[in-house]
UniProtKB/Swiss-Prot annotation:
UniProt cross-references to PROSITE patterns, sorted A to Z: HSP70_1, HSP70_2, HSP70_3
UniProt similarity note: Belongs to the heat shock protein 70 family.
Phosphothreonine sites (modified residues): 198
Record's function text: Acts as a chaperone.
Keyword GTP-binding: no
Organism annotation: Borrelia garinii subsp. bavariensis (strain ATCC BAA-2496 / DSM 23469 / PBi)
A GO MF term: ATP-dependent protein folding chaperone
Ranges annotated as biased composition (Basic and acidic residues): 620-635
Keywords: ATP-binding, Chaperone, Nucleotide-binding, Phosphoprotein, Stress response
Description of what induces expression: By stress conditions e.g. heat shock.
Protein name: Chaperone protein DnaK
Top-level lineage group: Bacteria
Length: 635
């Protein structure tokens, strides 16, 4: 069995790790970073950029640079109204009602899983470069509070990236694995995970290699992006007061504000104030305008207090659902970059009555845990068992629009539950089964995961037919539902594919697109390498030509100069084969210089040897004399 990599597919950053010799290792990307920005961009030439290179051009290309796409994964268009306001790129309604991104530079509408797949491909390639072998399998993490549609979308993203997703693991659970891999004693741990776009809290019991999740809760609309947004709104307001100019509709200015807000937020975790300086942020009739502002930690904490407080209720619910008191918890682990905010650390202490444990790297713990889970699946990591839970209750709509729950939230997975229902009307020959996820009493107030029809039921008075509905949740938290008429034995099964999910044909098309992109990326890399080789040869040849111009014939010199000129002209074209052939021609032409350099070097060596009283070995006579002396010694 090959290596299974562990990927933390984050809202802001992603990270990849692998098990080596029983230890998890975080893999550096090609730029030397241990985490990679979860950013994908398309240039005006249609070139795709992923990671740091995409982040570097955000300000100048805001509408075609996609960040925080995780907020739109598996979501219907009407569910993301608040998220749309937070991003400069265009979100549209897809044909099946899901949220999609319109990318003007490639004139294409793309789904969130397709965009996330680009980041996963970068993670896959990072691991392949490190391991020196092809990678096809992965464990990918998701927020614990992700619903079925969001989990399925994540799995689809993996498939598009050419990865078989062996397991979907909840982020707090993965972090607990990273924390507890070498712990032997029993303890109860809370994982407080505040990332770029989501918040999760999970309570786990650890002991003897068993990691059992007791409860989980969270908010998939709360994360570091929201904290950045508060700073942005404040800066826009202050600038408007000062200059009477509203920056809220200037996409390029908003992108600069986004970068500055994120930087200030990070600075305020270690300093009492942060200076924000954005020269030439805009202009009016009087000339350019500059934004200068000093944000204090006290002001920042005042601005984001409502967000900090929003994390309290999920924590209290999780403690209650686990059947515990805050004092029963032995350790509180912080995960996610936003947990570095002092106000967050303070509320964690207030909720749990203890200082949080800072022994786990909040940026890498989730990927490390995913790698450990990969090791468990391959058998490389032994004596460890992970028992996770479903975050939300599952059920069906019954008479009167009520949600009847079959599986309660925080049930250990995998699990299966069945219940017998009947018809609501006389002579009813089919039933429409609506599958729901959520905690509300009425069906309409919960999320419809999907629906299917069981027909062919024999006509009978209402209440007579016996229809068994079975829910099956696999280890990834993905739901499978079946309905069976007990009288006829007729059965209907479905794996829930949300109404906002991708169809198999769409996924297949996206896989082909991703493969085409991989080919494009390969060609682009070849092109860059060919140009780099050519430029290097031109530089070396021109330098050598200058140095040895008096020692080579005018004909050779002219021939070399012509080849340099031809190669320079080919660099303006995108023809790799032409660049390579002309590079080879210049290489051959420049051999004349190499001969002169070698001859010059040989003469210099001979001169040095004579000065040291050593006879030169370059002449034929010298070689013979040396041979004869050696021969005499042998006699």
């Amino acid at each position: 069995m090959g290596k299974i990599i562990g990927i933390d597919l984050g809202t802001t950053n992603s990270c990849v790790a692998i098990m080596e010799h029983g230890k998890p290792v975080v893999i550096q990307n090609s730029e030397g970073g241990r985490t990679t920005p979860s950013i994908v961009a398309y240039t005006n030439k249609g070139e795709r950029l992923v990671g740091q290179v995409a982040k570097n051009q955000m300000v100048t290309n805001p509408e075609n640079t996609i960040y925080s796409i995780k907020r739109f994964m598996g979501r219907r268009f009407e569910e993301v109204a608040s998220e749309i306001k937070m991003v400069p790129y265009k979100i549209e309604k897809g044909l099946n009602g899901d949220a999609r991104v319109n990318i003007s530079n490639i004139k294409k509408q793309m789904s969130p899983p397709e965009i996330s797949a680009a980041t996963l491909t970068k993670m896959k390639e990072t691991a392949e470069a490190y391991l020196g072998e092809k990678v096809t399998e992965a464990v990918i993490t998701v927020p614990a509070y992700f619903n079925d549609a969001q989990r399925q979308a994540t799995k689809d993203a993996g498939k598009i990236a050419g990865l078989e997703v062996k397991r979907i693991v909840n982020e707090p659970t993965a972090a607990a694995l990273a924390y507890g891999i070498e712990k032997k004693h029993e303890e109860i741990v809370a994982v407080y995970d505040l990332g770029g776009g989501t918040f999760d809290i999970s309570i786990l019991e650890l002991g003897d290699g068993v990691f059992e999740v007791k409860s989980t809760n969270g908010d998939t609309h709360l994360g570091g992006d929201n904290f950045d947004d508060e700073i942005i709104k404040h800066l826009i307001s202050e600038f408007k007061k000062e200059s009477a100019i509203d920056l809220s509709n200037d996409k390029m200015a908003l992108q600069r504000l986004k970068e500055a807000a994120e930087k200030a937020k990070i600075e305020l975790s270690g300093a009492q104030e942060a200076s924000i300086n954005l020269p030439f942020i805009t202009a009016d009739a009087n000339g350019p305008k500059h934004l200068q502002y000093t944000l204090t930690r006290a002001k920042f904490e005042q601005m984001v207090d409502h967000l900090v407080q929003k994390t309290k209720e999920p924590c209290l619910k999780a403690i209650k659902d686990a059947g515990l008191k805050a004092s029963d918890i032995n350790e509180v682990i912080l995960v996610g970059g936003s947990t570095r905010i002092p106000a967050i650390q303070k509320i964690v202490k207030d909720i749990f009555g203890q200082d949080p444990n800072k022994g786990v790297n909040p940026d890498e713990a989730v990927a490390i845990g995913a790698a450990i889970q990969g090791g468990i699946l391959t058998g490389e990591t032994k004596d460890m068992v992970l028992l996770d839970v479903t975050p939300l209750s599952l059920g069906i709509e019954t008479l009167g629009g009520v949600m009847t729950k079959l599986i309660e939230r925080n049930t250990t997975i995998p699990t299966k539950k069945s219940q017998v229902f009947s018809t609501a009307a006389d002579n009813q020959t089919s039933v429409d089964i609506k599958v729901l996820q959520g905690e509300r009493e009425m069906a309409a107030q919960n999320r419809i995961l999907g629906n299917f029809i069981l027909d062919g039921i024999p006509a009978a008075p209402r209440g007579v037919p016996q229809i068994e509905v079975s829910f099956d949740i696999d280890a990834n938290g993905i739901v499978h539902v079946s309905a069976k008429d007990m009288g006829t034995g007729k059965e209907q099964k479905i794996r829930i594919e949300s109404s906002s999910g991708l169809s198999e044909s769409e996924i297949d098309r996206m896989v082909k697109d991703a493969e085409a992109h991989a080919e494009e990326d390969k060609k682009l890399k070849e092109n860059i390498e060919a140009k780099n080789t050519a430029n290097s040869l031109i530089y070396q040849t021109e330098k050598s030509l200058k140095e040895y111009s008096e020692k080579i014939s005018s004909e050779d010199k002219e021939a070399i100069e012509n080849k340099i000129k031809e190669l320079k002209e080919s660099l303006d074209k995108e023809d790799i084969s032409l660049i390579k052939s002309r590079t080879e021609e210049l290489q051959k032409a420049s051999y004349k210089i190499a001969e002169m350099m070698y001859k010059d070097s040989s003469q210099q060596n001979a001169s040095n040897q004579q000065e040291n009283g050593t006879q030169s070995n370059t002449s034929e006579e010298g070689k013979e004399a040396d041979y004869e002396v050696v021969d005499e010694d042998k006699k």
